[in-house]
From Swiss-Prot:
EC number per UniProt: 2.4.2.17
Protein name: ATP phosphoribosyltransferase
Known function: Catalyzes the condensation of ATP and 5-phosphoribose 1-diphosphate to form N'-(5'-phosphoribosyl)-ATP (PR-ATP). Has a crucial role in the pathway because the rate of histidine biosynthesis seems to be controlled primarily by regulation of HisG enzymatic activity.
GO molecular function, one term: ATP phosphoribosyltransferase activity
Gene responsible for this protein: hisG
Location, primary (coarse class): cytoplasm
Family annotation (Pfam families): HisG
Pathway noted in the entry: Amino-acid biosynthesis; L-histidine biosynthesis; L-histidine from 5-phospho-alpha-D-ribose 1-diphosphate: step 1/9
Amino acid sequence: MTITIALPSKGRMKDDASAIFERAGMTITAVGNDRSYRGRVEGWDDVEVAFLSASEISRELGNGTVDFGVTGEDLMREGFAEVDKRVEFCARLGFGHADVVVAVPEIWLDVDTMADLGDVAADFRARHSRRLAIATKYWRLTQQFFSSQHGIQLYRIVESLGATEGAPAAGSADIIVDITSTGSTLRANHLKVLQDGVILHSQACLVRARKESHADEPVVQAIIDAVRAAL
């Protein structure tokens, strides 16, 4: 069978992923021209490469339409419920680091932890007759973190279609859940991350779709072993 590896199609993620595969003895070349969305691995005739966006890679992995992919852990865990039943996180690759965090306005001086925020959520309902509004693109991770892990129920999620960090200042939300690498954008918007408000330390991962056909396919384990040895 042919094994398909989905890799980022552009930017730093593409360069970093290609470098790791090259160290693993799996040099990747485009089929056709440099702007092609298909590729191959030199010396691995039963492996093909698809160049996709990070969000496309996570979707194709979750649906099982590719065998391997390099994408952010945040995209996989946000995109699918019980994601570990669908895919295996084979290796964390050491690039694409970013944290999914809970951030509140800096002027909330007495709110530093999720417990403090739980008190605020209850107070919002009592004082304003509405629930605390959270702007985010990460509704699944937000619900799991607030409701399942911290027992906070009195909130509502406002879907963020633009720059999430601007939502509190614009009045469309009270707080945010967003992804950040350095925190500089949050600080520029006068937001602070709660002390225990890191939902996920994300980075680029080699992810395998869980397929029965992989059990008897030696090239599957060979790919995993080669990448792990290159880290």
